[in-house]
C-alpha cells in the first residue's frame, strides 16, 4: 500500500520568551505579530503620523520609524502625542544606527515615547567606541524599561567578528565555505550582543532578535540555527526582498518555510514600493501569509476558480472581486459588530465542474453557470443547497443572502 502523508497543521511553535512591546505581546504563546515601517522623514510630523495611522489601520500592530538625527528624535514625542489625540494607541519602534546612543541620551522624551528600540550591532559604533556606545543604549533601555530588538543585517555586519571567524576557519583542516562563515557571523553577532545586553542588566523578556539577509536559502539557514541556539523571541524578515511579485514571492517562501517549522514570533514583509505606491501593501501581504498558513484569521476568505474555457463569462470574476472588496472594506466595523466574522469562508465559482463541491465546503457559496450550462446558480449554506438563483440579478441576490447570513450567524442580538 502506498504511504499517505498527513499534515493537518504546521509544526508546534518554538517556545520563546514573551516580550511586551507597548500593549502588544511578542513571543511566548501569543499570536504571531504583524509589523511594518514608515518611509517618511520622521522629522515631518504630519506625514509620519498619517503613514503610521494608515499602517495601523491596515493591521500593523507595531510600526517602526527611523530616528536618524536630532530633528527626528525631537519629533518622536510629538508623533506619539498626535497619534494618541487621534485615538491611535500604537507602539512605536525607534530604528537607530550610528548615533542612537546620542539621540536617546540627549532626547529623553524620545526615549520615553518609544515602545522599543532597534539596535544594529554592526553599526552601533566602531573600534573602541563600539562597546561603550552599545552599553549606553542598553543602559537607557534599562532606565526606561524598554525592550530592544538586536537587528543584525548582513549588509552591515560586524567586520571584526567576520574577520576573526574567517581567520579561525582558515586554520581548520576542513574549512567551511565563505557562505557558511557569513551565516555563522550573523548568528554569533545576534547572540553575543543579546548575552552582553543581559550582562548589563537588560532582562531576557526585553530582548528580540533578528538576523536578516537577502537570500532565501541563507535566511532559512540563519534563522534555523538561531532558533536552535536560543529562546529569545525572533523577528522574521527577508531584507531587500525587492519590488512587486518578486518581493512578495521571496518573502513568502522564506518566511513561510520558517513559520512551518515553528520559527518566528513577529514578521515584516519588506517590499520596495513603486513610486507613490501604497505602503500598506506589505501589511496586507503579511496578513495573507499568516492566514493562508492557518496561523491567524484577519478577514473572510473568498474562494474563486481561476477560470477556463468553460467560463467565458466574467460574471463570476466580477462577483468574486466585488464581494472580496466589500468584505475588506467593512471589516473595521464588522470586527466589533460581528465577532468571529474574520473566519467566514465564501465561494464564488464559475461552472458546474468544481462549483457545487467548493460551495459546499465554504460557509456560503454560489456556483454560477458556465458556458452552455443552464442559467441557474445554486447557493449553498453550510454544506446544504438552500436556493437556486436565476435571471439577471443573481449577483445582487447572492449579496443579500450573504449579508443575511453574516447577520444571522455572527450578530449578537
UniProtKB/Swiss-Prot annotation:
Coiled coil: none annotated. SUPFAM superfamilies: Nitrite and sulphite reductase 4Fe-4S domain-like. It comes from the Bacteria. Belongs to the IspG family. GO terms for molecular function: 4 iron, 4 sulfur cluster binding; 4-hydroxy-3-methylbut-2-en-1-yl diphosphate synthase activity (ferredoxin); 4-hydroxy-3-methylbut-2-enyl-diphosphate synthase activity (flavodoxin); iron ion binding. Its cofactor is [4Fe-4S] cluster. Keywords: 4Fe-4S, Iron, Iron-sulfur, Isoprene biosynthesis, Metal-binding, Oxidoreductase. It catalyses: (2E)-4-hydroxy-3-methylbut-2-enyl diphosphate + oxidized [flavodoxin] + H2O + 2 H(+) = 2-C-methyl-D-erythritol 2,4-cyclic diphosphate + reduced [flavodoxin]. Binds 1 [4Fe-4S] cluster. Converts 2C-methyl-D-erythritol 2,4-cyclodiphosphate (ME-2,4cPP) into 1-hydroxy-2-methyl-2-(E)-butenyl 4-diphosphate. PANTHER family: 4-HYDROXY-3-METHYLBUT-2-EN-1-YL DIPHOSPHATE SYNTHASE (PTHR30454), 4-HYDROXY-3-METHYLBUT-2-EN-1-YL DIPHOSPHATE SYNTHASE (FERREDOXIN), CHLOROPLASTIC (PTHR30454:SF0). It holds the Pfam family GcpE. It comes from Bartonella henselae (strain ATCC 49882 / DSM 28221 / CCUG 30454 / Houston 1) (Rochalimaea henselae). [4Fe-4S] cluster binds at residues 305, 308, 351, 358. This is 4-hydroxy-3-methylbut-2-en-1-yl diphosphate synthase (flavodoxin). GO terms for biological process: isopentenyl diphosphate biosynthetic process, methylerythritol 4-phosphate pathway; terpenoid biosynthetic process. Its EC number is 1.17.7.3. It is an enzyme of class 1 (oxidoreductase).
Amino acid at each position: 500500500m502506498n504511504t499517505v502523508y498527513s499534515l493537518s497543521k504546521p509544526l508546534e511553535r518554538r517556545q520563546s520568551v514573551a516580550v511586551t512591546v507597548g500593549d502588544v505581546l511578542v513571543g511566548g504563546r501569543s499570536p504571531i505579530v504583524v509589523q511594518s515601517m514608515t518611509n517618511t522623514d520622521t522629522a515631518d510630523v504630519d506625514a509620519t503620523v498619517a503613514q503610521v495611522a494608515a499602517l495601523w489601520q491596515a493591521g500593523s500592530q507595531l510600526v517602526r520609524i527611523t530616528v536618524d538625527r536630532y530633528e527626528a528624535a525631537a519629533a518622536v514625542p510629538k508623533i506619539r502625542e498626535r497619534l494618541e489625540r487621534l485615538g491611535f494607541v500604537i507602539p512605536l519602534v525607534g530604528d537607530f544606527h550610528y548615533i542612537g546612543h546620542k539621540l536617546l541620551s540627549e532626547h529623553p522624551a524620545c526615549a520615553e515615547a518609544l515602545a522599543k528600540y532597534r539596535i544594529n550591532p554592526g553599526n552601533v559604533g566602531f573600534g573602541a567606541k563600539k562597546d561603550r556606545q552599545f552599553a549606553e543604549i542598553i543602559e537607557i533601555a534599562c532606565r526606561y524599561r524598554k525592550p530592544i530588538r538586536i537587528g543584525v543585517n548582513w549588509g552591515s555586519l560586524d567586520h571584526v567578528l567576520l574577520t576573526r571567524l574567517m581567520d579561525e576557519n582558515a586554520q581548520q583542516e576542513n574549512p567551511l565555505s565563505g557562505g557558511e562563515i557569513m551565516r555563522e557571523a550573523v548568528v554569533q553577532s545576534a547572540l553575543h550582543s543579546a548575552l552582553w545586553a543581559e550582562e548589563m542588566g537588560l532582562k531576557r523578556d526585553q530582548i528580540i532578535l533578528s538576523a536578516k539577509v537577502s537570500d532565501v536559502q541563507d535566511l532559512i539557514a540563519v534563522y534555523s540555527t538561531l532558533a536552535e541556539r536560543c529562546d529569545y523571541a525572533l523577528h522574521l524578515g527577508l531584507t531587500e526582498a525587492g519590488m512587486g511579485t518578486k518581493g512578495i514571492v521571496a518573502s513568502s517562501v522564506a518566511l513561510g518555510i520558517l513559520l512551518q517549522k515553528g520559527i518566528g514570533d513577529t514578521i515584516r514583509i519588506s517590499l520596495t514600493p513603486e513610486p507613490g505606491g501604497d505602503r500598506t501593501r506589505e501589511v496586507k501581504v503579511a496578513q495573507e501569509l499568516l492566514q493562508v498558513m492557518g496561523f491567524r484569521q484577519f478577514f473572510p476568505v473568498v474562494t474563486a476558480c481561476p477560470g477556463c474555457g468553460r467560463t467565458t463569462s466574467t460574471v463570476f470574476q466580477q462577483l468574486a472581486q466585488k464581494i472580496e472588496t466589500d468584505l475588506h472594506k467593512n471589516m473595521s466595523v464588522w470586527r466589533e459588530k460581528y465577532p468571529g466574522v474574520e473566519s467566514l469562508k465564501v465561494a464564488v465559482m464559475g461552472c458546474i465542474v468544481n462549483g457545487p463541491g467548493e460551495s459546499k465546503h465554504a460557509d456560503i457559496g454560489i456556483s454560477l453557470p458556465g458556458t452552455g450550462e443552464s442559467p441557474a446558480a445554486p447557493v449553498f449554506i453550510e454544506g446544504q443547497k438552500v436556493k437556486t438563483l436565476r435571471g439577471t440579478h443573481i449577483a445582487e441576490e447572492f449579496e443579500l443572502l450573504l449579508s443575511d447570513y453574516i447577520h444571522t450567524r455572527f450578530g449578537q442580538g
